[in-house]
Amino acid sequence: MGHMVNAIAQIDEFVNLGANSIETDVSFDSSANPEYTYHGVPCDCRRWCKKWEYFNNFLKALRKATTPGDSKYHEKLVLVVFDLKTGSLYDNQASDAGKKLAKSLLQNYWNNGNNGGRAYIVLSIPNLAHYKLIAGFKEALTSEGHPELMDKVGYDFSGNDDIGDVANAYKEAGVTGHVWQSDGITNCLLRGLDRVRKAVANRDSSNGYVNKVYYWTVDKRQSTRDALDAGVDGIMTNYPDVIADVLNESAYKAKFRIASYDDNPWETFKN
């Protein structure tokens, strides 16, 4: 999972390095419209924090990269995580942000339901209090006549909150599937795997809410091995080639592989 892919040129760059998924930051204006693909300062060590595009322009380029037959098509790119920077919004704007985000995606990515981009989408929300963004998103797609597109949409609360609190937020949001649980910290700092293991245990329990667990931001071979040993489903990185190298090591290549479009990202993998 390629981290902080905010310029159109970076889509090709990260997929060519081995990423089958990218993460893109989405900033909002004061009226809760998705405005830019932009992270800003501070960001990960050894990365330029200020690359950006207008959100709708990025979506159009992403559509080309994920539409079979297009000259820019990458068969390998199957999942996009939108890191929604909702910290600039009031809590009562969350539903509006979801509606406006859905309409932008419908028009510019899904091409109004007519042979749009095929990648699966994860809406990653940093604040549990913004759970109404999910209902707003679903409501907009339904009112625009495309509720079937929700089959392509999953969810993540990215604030490293207590697993029980995250479960309650999903209950409030009415979400019962398509859940990716993230855990992590900037590559400038160290973070243990305790919460990852709790998320994995939730995923593997009979009554958990988690379908997939991913860990960020992992740039070193040893931390990649540690995350794989903990049982994660995905690893977000600034260096997709490092992850690909580790997956080819004898200890891992029989147990893990890069997911393809035929793999269901909402289905919990049972080994």
Swiss-Prot record:
EC number(s) reported in the record = 4.6.1.-
Write out the transmembrane intervals: none
Tell whether Lipid metabolism is among the UniProt keywords. yes
Q: List the disulfide bonds in this chain.
A: C43-C49, C45-C188
Q: Where is the active site?
A: H3, H39 (nucleophile)
Tell me the residue numbers annotated for binding Mg(2+). Answer: E23, D25, D83
Q: Which reaction does it catalyse?
A: an N-(acyl)-sphingosylphosphocholine = an N-(acyl)-sphingosyl-1,3-cyclic phosphate + choline; an N-(acyl)-sphingosylphosphoethanolamine = an N-(acyl)-sphingosyl-1,3-cyclic phosphate + ethanolamine; a 1-acyl-sn-glycero-3-phosphocholine = a 1-acyl-sn-glycero-2,3-cyclic phosphate + choline; a 1-acyl-sn-glycero-3-phosphoethanolamine = a 1-acyl-sn-glycero-2,3-cyclic phosphate + ethanolamine
What's one Pfam family the UniProt record gives for this protein?
GDPD_2
Coiled-coil region list? none
Q: Which Gene Ontology molecular function entries are recorded, alphabetically?
A: lyase activity; metal ion binding; phosphoric diester hydrolase activity; toxin activity
| Keywords, comma-separated and alphabetical | Cytolysis, Dermonecrotic toxin, Disulfide bond, Glycoprotein, Hemolysis, Lipid degradation, Lipid metabolism, Lyase, Magnesium, Metal-binding, Secreted, Toxin
Tissue specificity field = Expressed by the venom gland.
Localization terms from the record: Secreted
A GO CC term attached to the entry: extracellular region
Q: Does the keyword Disulfide bond apply?
A: yes
A GO biological process of this protein is: killing of cells of another organism
* Residues of this chain annotated as glycosylated in UniProt: N248
Q: Which InterPro entries does this entry report, sorted A to Z?
A: PLC-like_Pdiesterase_TIM-brl
Write out the similarity annotation: Belongs to the arthropod phospholipase D family. Class II subfamily.
Q: What is the protein name given in its UniProt record?
A: Dermonecrotic toxin LarSicTox-alphaIB1c
